[in-house]
Structure formats: C-alpha cells, structure tokens
C-alpha cells in the first residue's frame, strides 16, 4: 500500500497543508516515487470524484523544476481530466490559458501523449480482430500446412500490418490475464507504481536473468513489468515459445524512447481503468469523442497533426 497515493486519491477537500505537501513531494529529487504517486493519486481523485478547479490548479502550478517523468505524468493526467470535465473547462478562459501554458511547454510531448490516448480507441478493434482470427484458425490448428490455414492468414494480412504500423497496444492482449494476482487485486496503488528492480525478487532465482533480459528488450509499461514478474513462472513456456530476442529488439527500436515512456503511463492508466476492480469509471471511453473536446483543440495544431490523430480515431 502506498500511503501518499491513497491519501491524495481519497481526500475530500485539498487543504493548504495537503497542497504544500504535494509541492514538496514533486520537488524532492531524492524520492521520485513519492512525487509520481502523489501525481497519480491526485489525478485519480479528480477523475473519480467531483470537479475541483482548486485541485486542478494545484497540479498545474506545481510543474516548475520537476523531474521529466513527473511532468509526463502530469501532462497525461491533465488530458484525461480535461476530457472528463470538458463542459466545466471549455468556457473558463483563465483556466484554459493555464492549461495551454502547461500543455504547450513541451508540444512534442503533449502531442505524443494525446496520440497515445487516441490510440487506445483501437484496442477494442484489435481485440475483435484477435477473437475472429482465433475462431477461424482454431479448427485448423492441427493442420498448419493446409492451404486454408494460410489463406486465412493472407486474408488478414492487411489488418496485421495496420496493427503493427499504428503501434497499437498489443501487450494489452498478452498481459490482461496477468492482472488477477493479489498484488493488483488487493492494492490499487500497485497499478500505477513506477518500476523498481526489486520486483525481480518475486521471480524464481533461476529465471531472473531471463526476465531481466526480457525487460531490457521489451517496451512494457511499468504495470506490465510487475505483472510479468508476478506470473512468469506460470506462463514462461508460452512466453519463450512466442517471443524471440530479434522480435523484441525490433519492437523496441521501432518506437522513439520518449514515446515509449509517455505511452507507458497511458497504458498503465488504461489497464487500471479497464481491468481493475478498484474503480468504476472509464475515462478512456471519452477518447472516441476526442475531436469534439477542448483538449483536441489545444494540442492538435496544423493539418498534419490533425491527420495523424484522426487516423488513430478512424
């Protein structure tokens, strides 16, 4: 249990003391995890409860001089908050100016974060594709050399290429069943923990080098890393049979590092809201209406940017 996360997630009103502590957590260079969990907790507080301009302004005015990882969490969280409270925000000109100042401080980061939020709209399409492909191939699994087996693969080739090209979250399909452990079931904060190598101690000693090697090559979000450590012993046969070092290198090298980091936090939040029993809201469903929201207008500037985001929402 992370006391800082729980405190900021569950508090009703943000007192002056809470606000001062929040800023201290974000400014402490020696304890990055406390700041990251404070940001996650206050973000969830806003998303899961009622609108509070004071809480949002506390987040927005705490950005100066903080670590890049913390700022990335703030940008992603602020975008989801803007989506959730679009009606309250869109006519508040002063607040919109403050939001724009934060979101345009690092425009490439903000555009990448919004792109990754838009990209989540394709996950259900990807799930449907996988279900259909499995249903079609299952009767032929004992005869993989049949013409019919390869005809089906060829007929689905364009969709497979689309999934690869769009950098869709294929790891979600792999790891969604890994989140049933007590580690996630009993503690909401574990879904949003930053990665700590100490988690490798949960892996059998003879498997630790293998898991560490996978983590070095596989661009997983932090909660997927924890899930892998929790469940590796049960699934290592499947993992070893399906993955190769070359394929993992290709996936990792194909995406810029800043996109992997930002996308990782988007994926952590997506897993929390989609898979966790600790929450009842689904803020990522609002991404289907992204073009109608103020966050889209603030971030998507120019035809090329519009075309890029709209392609993800198609």
Over which residues does each language-model region extend?
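N-terminal uDENN/longin-like adaptor modules and analogous extended polar/low-complexity scaffolding regions
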Residues: 1-29
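Amphipathic alpha-helical elements of HEAT/ARM-like alpha-solenoid repeat scaffolds that form extended
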Residues: 3-10, 35-43, 72-79, 109-119
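Structural recognition of alpha-solenoid helical scaffolds
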Residues: 14-22, 34, 38, 51-58, ...
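Alpha-helical protein-protein interaction scaffolds
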Residues: 27-97, 314
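Long, charge-dense low-complexity segments
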Residues: 60-67, 71, 75-79, 142, ...
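Eukaryote-biased recognition of long, low-complexity, charge-rich segments
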Residues: 85-163
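C-terminal regulatory domains involved in ligand/effector binding and gene-expression control
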Residues: 128, 148, 155, 162-179, ...
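Alpha-solenoid helical-repeat scaffolds
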Residues: 199-314
């Amino acid at each position: 249990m992370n006391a800082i996360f729980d405190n900021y997630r569950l508090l009703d009103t943000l007192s002056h003391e809470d606000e001062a502590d929040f800023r201290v957590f974000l400014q402490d260079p020696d304890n990055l995890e406390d700041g990251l969990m404070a940001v996650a907790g206050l973000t969830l507080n806003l998303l899961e409860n009622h609108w509070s301009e004071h809480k949002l302004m506390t987040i927005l005015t705490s950005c100066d001089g903080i670590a890049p990882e913390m700022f990335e969490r703030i940008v992603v969280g602020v975008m989801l908050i803007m989506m959730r409270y679009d009606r309250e925000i869109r006519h508040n000109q002063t607040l919109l100016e403050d939001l724009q100042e934060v979101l345009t401080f690092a425009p490439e980061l903000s555009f990448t974060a919004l792109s990754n939020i838009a990209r989540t709209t394709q996950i259900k399409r990807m799930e449907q594709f996988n279900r259909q492909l499995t249903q079609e191939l299952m009767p032929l699994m004992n005869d993989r050399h049949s013409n019919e087996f390869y005809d089906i693969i060829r007929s689905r080739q364009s969709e497979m290429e689309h999934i690869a090209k769009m950098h869709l979250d294929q790891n979600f399909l792999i790891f969604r069943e890994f989140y049933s452990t007590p580690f996630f079931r009993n503690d909401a904060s574990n879904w949003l923990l930053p990665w700590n190598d100490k988690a490798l101690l949960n892996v059998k000693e003879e498997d630790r080098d293998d898991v560490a090697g996978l983590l070095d090559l596989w661009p997983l979000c932090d909660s997927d890393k924890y899930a892998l450590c929790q469940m590796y012993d049960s699934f290592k046969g499947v993992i070893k049979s399906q993955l190769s070092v070359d394929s993992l290198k290709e996936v990792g090298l194909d995406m810029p590092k800043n996109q992997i980091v930002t996308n990782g936090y988007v994926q952590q939040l997506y897993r929390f809201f989609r898979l966790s029993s600790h929450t009842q809201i689904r803020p990522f469903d609002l991404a289907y209406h992204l073009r109608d929201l103020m966050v889209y207008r603030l971030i998507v500037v120019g035809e090329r940017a519009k075309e890029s985001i709209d392609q993800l929402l198609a």
